[in-house]
Every structure is written in C-alpha cells, then in structure tokens.
Amino acid sequence: MTASHHSKGRRHGHSRHGHGRTKSVLWRINWLFIILAAVASGLVAYFLLTYKILAGRGYHLWVLGGLGAVLLLLILLNGLKRLGKTTLVLATVVILGASYGAYQMNATVNFFNKLNTNTQKQELTMSLATLAEGGVADVSALDGKVVLAPLGQDRENVQALVDDLKAKRQVRVTVEEVPSYLAAYQQLLDGKAQAMVLNSGYESLLEGMASDFSSKIKKLYQYNHVTEVAAQPAKPEAANQQTSQTPAENQPFNLYISGIDTFGPVSSVSRSDVNVIATINPKTHQILLTTTPRDAYVPIADGGADQKDKLTHAGIYGVEASMHTLARLYDTPIDYYVRLNFTSFLNIIDTVGGIDVYNDQAFTSLYGKYDFPVGELHLNADQALGFVRERYSLSGGDNDRGKNHEKVITALIKKLGSRQTLLQAQEVMDRMSQSVQTNLPLAKVMELVNEQLESGQAYTVTSVALTGHGSTGLPSYAMPGAELYMMQVDETSLAERQAQIKQVLGQ
C-alpha cells in the first residue's frame, strides 16, 4: 500500500470523526432546546389550567395535547441523529410560540390584577382656599384663624386636612361649621372668613352653581387624601350593607357601570354622571342595560345618610355609595362594578379605531361643537365624548342623554369583542389599565368567555331607562339651599325596570 493510500485513509477517518463530533454537539444542543420548549410549554399549561383560559369546549386540552405531542416528537426526532437540524428548527418554533403565548396570558392576568388593585384606592384632594383677589397670600397667615367647612357632611376629610396642615406646616386653624360647601363659598365671598375648606369631589357641584367659581378662588394648601376601599356586592335590603357572596359559576349577575365626571385619575372621587346596571345572564345570553338618569331624586346611601338627592351626588361618597343606592332602588343585588372616567373614553375608543352608533335625533353638542345628523355615525373618542355629554340639545334632555350613554357603551362592548380588537389586545389593555377600575375578577371573565366558546350564541342586548318628571326646589343633602333640577322617579317606570331586571336574572 502506497503512502498516498495511507494519507487518504487518515483523511477519511478524520472526516468521519469530525462529522460524528458535529452530530454529537448538535444532539446536545437539541436536548437543551427540547428542555427549554418543555419549560415554555409548562408555563402555557400553568396559565391555561390555573385561570381556565380557553376552557370552553376543552380548547385548552387540545392546546396542551398538541404541545405534549410535539414535545414527544422532538424527543423521538432527536434520537434519529440524521434529523438533528429539523429537530432544532422545530424546537425553536415551539419555544418561540409557547413563550409568546405564556407572555400574552401573563399580561392578561397582570392587567386584571392591576384593575382590581385600582379598586382598592380612592383619592380626593382637600384644600384650603381663599379669594383670588384680596385673599391671604400664604397659608401661614391662617395660623390661629377661623376657616369654614361643612363638618356635618364631611367631618372625616376636613379633619384629615387640618391634621396634615398642623403636622407639615405647623399651622393651626379653627374650623367653623357651615351647612355646605356652597354656604362656605358664599360666606367667603361675603368676607365672613379668610378661607374655606374645599373637597375636590364637590368642586364640579360648585361650578354648576357658580360658573366663575374656579376663577374666584385660589388654593393655599392641598392634601391628597387616599383611602382604602374594598367594594363588595351590595344587598338590596340594606343600602349600607355588603355581602361577600358572589354569583355562582355561569349564574346571572348585575354589573354597575359608572362614568365619573372628571378628566383626572379614575381613582378620584367625583360625581357619577353615567349610571348603568348591566344585568347579564350567561345561560340565556341576555344583557339588559338599565340607565338611571343622573338627576333621579332618590335616597342616597352611605355618606348621603339615606337622604334624597340627585343620584349623581352619590359618586362623591364613593362607588360603594352608588352601588348601594341603586341596589336598594331596584331591589336587586349588584355584584360587580366597572368605573371609568371621560379620559377612558378618549383612550379606549381611539385605541379600537372608533365606534359606530345610530343617532335618532339631530343635534349639535356643546362640547366640541360637533354636528350629529340622524343616522349611522362613526365616532372617534372626542366625538363620542361630545355625544354622551350633551343633554340640553336633546328633546328628552337627560333621559335622551342616558340613551346615548347606552348606545356608546353597547358599541364599545361590540368593538372590544371584535377580531380586529383582539389582535391589538395588549395595547387596549395598557390603555384601559390606566383609566378603569373594576372588582370583576378574571375568573368571572373567563367564565363568560368559556361559556361563549361552548355555545357560540350571540348575546341579545336590550336597553331601557328609568323615567320621571322634572322638578326644581327639592332639598339636596349635598347642596342644601341650592335650587337644583331633579327628576322625580315615576313609580310605574320603576316597577317596570325592577321587573325587567328580575326577569333577566331568572327570578
């Protein structure tokens, strides 16, 4: 055998050994990727099983079965070393796909956790205010002086401000009681005191009585008063009581939808201008939206001391007060709530690309000066805000505004459930988490989604409204002495609304 033959033999030997080492390295890499794919699949399994995601029709089991089959295939393929590259590509696809799925499910869980955490906070700003012209220059000038405040209405918050002022600025003030914040403002204008206490929740009420209120005063000191709340389901038999009982799985329930009158954080205490009870029956696929006009003259629970006032004023005592007030009015439990502010409309409606509503009367809105003709309308966020705020240009006034609230809510619900919106779910959730509060848990949402997957039946949405007749001069607990427009509830209309709610609940 020649030297050249020996040389070729050695080269072929080295080639076989080199190729074998390459396969061995690829085999080890594949095992690493298979393990990573198993971990990612395990995360998917955790979210699917823990939160019952896609449990309708057992879709979650199909997903888990598919992932399990692919993992088994990867193990078998890796045993066939000739298919090492195919194994690597498939394992990479599983890692990326499962990781993305786990990420999206984790984002959804965090989204609801954030919304539910938002419900635990309620904030308002307590201020010491003086006249913009001729008032004191600095809060230190009030040391030892008298300030005006409605202790009978708001003692706890007023005292919190006084204590904070004393602790942080060493300024001690004496509080002189007046009947209301409106009375305090009037006496401030009359020069009977140098300063008044002001609760931010009442500012919009004062602006409604005196359009130049904000320009007439200046704030010397502000204290952001944050309280912890935990709104539980409201019982109808006692407006100021709660129950920890929540509806059983797939049972009908009531959801209170509140739209607050502010552009600030959703946790801000404010009047509730939108008051809708959504009665949802997952078995019959019915949703009944019952609107109660903001001016409805009803007994206000909790901070309202069960005295009659405008429904909108319940919001200044917190979302629980509104829930309890409506639960007693309609003689029905209210299990959950969603609270959003007008900033929410601006954020969410633009995020989903606008909404479509049918307008049954032409009008021009005071806000934005938008012209709304009769017929189908496509609204962006700002147009929708003008659409839901307007009442003076509508033939039915506040009743018609309530109907427009329902139209926008219904249109938004439909848009949020569309395929296009689902594709941008992350952006929608990011926007909503900044401007929505709810105690509706993820588990209840998954119940509804899974039931919908099981049946495939669309929901029938019906809108109704409580009616009454207008009246001026009725006493207001929040604004004693003020001449306010109220809507005295029509008892026949109330009985009809109560019966409709009970019918959808299956009672």
Give, region by region, the residue ranges found by the protein language model.
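A short, flexible N-terminal coil/short beta segment enriched in small residues
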Residues: L90-G97, A137-S140, T279-I280
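Non-catalytic, solvent-exposed segments at the cell envelope interface
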Residues: N113-K121, L131-A132, D138-V139, V146-Q153, ...
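Hydrophobic alpha-helical transmembrane segments in integral membrane proteins
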Residues: G101-N118
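Internal/C-terminal transmembrane anchor helices
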Residues: L83-N106
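Membrane-anchoring/interfacial helices and their immediately flanking loops
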Residues: M1-A40
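N-terminal Sec-pathway targeting helices
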Residues: K23-I34, I75-A91
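Membrane-embedded alpha-helical segments of integral membrane proteins
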Residues: W27-L76
